A protein has these predicted regions:
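Glycine/tyrosine- and acidic-biased, solvent-exposed loop/turn segments at the edges of beta-strands
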Residues: 1-195
């Protein structure tokens, strides 16, 4: 450890080391509060985490890295609360998911992606709950599920498709429960009777 004090409070750069002597953390303090750049490293010296503190709270962009140095995820903070997009990446660098935050709650369009960049899921969040149309896709881009949410609860139409685009099931949800008549198709049975 290397510490600096001013008026009995941590002030300046704080460094923590692994037993082998390589840097583990480099942190800035001002009047006893985390303030400024923050870095965390692996034993091998690779950057694992970086961000900024402002008067003891996470602020601005934070980055998480894999041991190979590639970006794993990034977050934006305001007053120690997620605010902005949180983005996760595949090792290839392709976006895996994008989550919109407003003052700590998911708000906006949530999207996830397959490793090739094709869409995987898409849904709108309002005040931390799914709201409106939800879509999920197969890896080849074909539609897998279409559903609807109201305040985080399944409400309305539900359609489920196989990877050939054939309808598997269709029905309605009301306050999270299946209601009414549901159509369910079993492609293997249908193909057998068509031969």
């Amino acid at each position: 450890y290397q510490l600096e004090f001013r008026e009995n409070l941590l002030d300046g750069v704080f460094e923590e080391f692994y037993p082998e002597g390589t840097a583990k953390k480099v942190v800035n303090y001002q009047k006893g509060l985390l303030h400024g750049d923050f870095f965390e490293f692996s034993k091998e010296g690779e950057l694992l985490l970086s961000g900024t503190y402002f008067q003891g709270e996470k602020s601005g962009d934070w980055f998480v890295y894999r041991s190979d140095g590639s970006l794993k995820s990034e977050y934006t903070y305001q007053n120690n609360v997620l605010n902005g997009f949180s983005i996760a990446y595949y090792a290839s660098g392709q976006v895996a998911e994008r989550i919109p935050f407003q003052m700590g709650e998911i708000n906006g369009i949530y999207e996830s992606f397959f490793p090739d960049g094709g869409p995987k899921q898409r849904v709108v969040f309002v005040d931390g709950q799914e709201q409106g149309e939800f879509t999920q896709f197969h890896a080849d881009g074909k539609l897998a599920i279409v559903a609807n949410f109201s305040k985080g609860i399944l409400e309305g139409i539900w359609e489920d498709y196989d990877d050939q685009g054939r309808l598997l099931s269709k029905g309605m949800y009301q306050q999270g429960d299946r209601v009414g008549e549901w159509k369910e198709v079993y492609p293997a049975v249908s193909e057998f009777y068509q031969k």
